[in-house]
């Protein structure tokens, strides 16, 4: 089961206690999943979803708000490998649509839900829960962080965006062909959104995966950094040994000043030690900077010999 489906199944079990919150969430389903038709010269509303647990929730909300329903299950065959659930409301559809603001008194269709249904914080949370259940998607946190809300039209998308801004979310509004969608890629904001709509179990799972992922990434960065440092140190040591061997061949190490001869012999005996480790073997011990200074002198001597200025 995908992480998005797990999250939706968790949310589908939340039935708001307040009737105002039930109506706010139901309004999201009517707008996002609803399809209007005519039956016996009357308006018929059909809500379609492939999610059985969401269909059950919508049925409960409609029943709690006094609407009679009929449910149909349509098998789309082996190619689709899933059923679709149709919840039909055949009575008082015009009253339902007018109540939510989707039809005005003159019978004109509107793309926005009545603002009175989402003026309270508790109702806004239920409304956003419905929006996510009806049109949301969420990547598994083990991959890229991405939460998306697919919406039926731009006017409704802007209304949803306005509600989200009240909670300081920074969803971006884009279009995929002609369909608008809002999306988030920030992990902290995705966690806040899950908390807002009541997906607490999914929030904990998301956070656990995120922590493990970030620790693993941090370890990888440290390993990569350490590997780069080791490669650099090995390259430097090889260059130092080549310079020392060249000096020994051309003029002999006995012709070096004692401090340089000492560090040269120490490097030849310990090709794998760092500058700091070499410094600790000297008497008295020498800092990393001091050791590096001596090797710079040896490098200059080797360069002078190669250029014929010494030897």
Curated annotation (Swiss-Prot):
It holds the Pfam family HTH_WhiA. GO terms for biological process: cell division; regulation of sporulation. It comes from the Bacteria. GO terms for molecular function: DNA binding. Keywords: Cell cycle, Cell division, DNA-binding. Residues 274-307 bind DNA. HAMAP family: HTH_type_WhiA. Involved in cell division and chromosome segregation. Belongs to the WhiA family. This is Probable cell division protein WhiA. The gene is whiA.
């Amino acid at each position: 089961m995908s992480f998005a489906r797990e999250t939706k199944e968790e949310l589908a079990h939340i039935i708001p206690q307040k009737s105002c919150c039930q109506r706010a969430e139901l309004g999201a389903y009517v707008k996002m999943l609803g399809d209007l038709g005519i039956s016996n010269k009357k308006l018929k509303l059909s809500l379609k979803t492939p999610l059985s647990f969401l269909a059950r929730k919508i049925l409960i909300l409609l029943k709690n708000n006094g609407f009679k329903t009929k449910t149909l299950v349509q098998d789309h065959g082996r190619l689709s490998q899933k059923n679709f659930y149709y919840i039909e409301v055949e009575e008082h559809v015009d009253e339902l649509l007018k109540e939510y603001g989707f039809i005005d008194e003159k019978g004109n269709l509107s793309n926005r839900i009545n603002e009175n249904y989402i003026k309270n914080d508790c109702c806004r949370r239920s409304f956003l829960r419905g929006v996510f259940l009806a049109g949301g998607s969420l990547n598994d946190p083990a991959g890229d962080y991405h939460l998306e809300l697919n919406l039926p039209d731009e006017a409704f998308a802007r209304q949803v965006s306005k509600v989200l801004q009240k909670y300081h979310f920074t969803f971006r509004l884009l279009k995929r062909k002609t369909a608008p969608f809002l999306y988030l890629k920030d992990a902290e904001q995705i966690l806040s959104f899950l908390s807002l709509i009541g997906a607490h179990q999914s929030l904990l799972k998301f956070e656990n995966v995120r922590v493990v992922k970030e620790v693993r990434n941090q370890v990888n960065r440290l390993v990569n950094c350490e590997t780069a440092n080791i490669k650099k140190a090995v390259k430097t040591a090889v260059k130092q040994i080549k310079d020392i061997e060249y000096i020994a061949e051309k003029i002999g190490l006995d012709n070096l000043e004692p401090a340089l001869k000492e560090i040269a012999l120490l490097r030849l005996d310990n090709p794998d030690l760092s500058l700091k480790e070499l410094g600790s073997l000297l008497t008295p011990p020498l800092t990393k900077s001091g050791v590096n200074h001596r090797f710079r002198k040896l490098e200059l001597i080797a360069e002078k010999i190669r250029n014929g200025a010494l030897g």
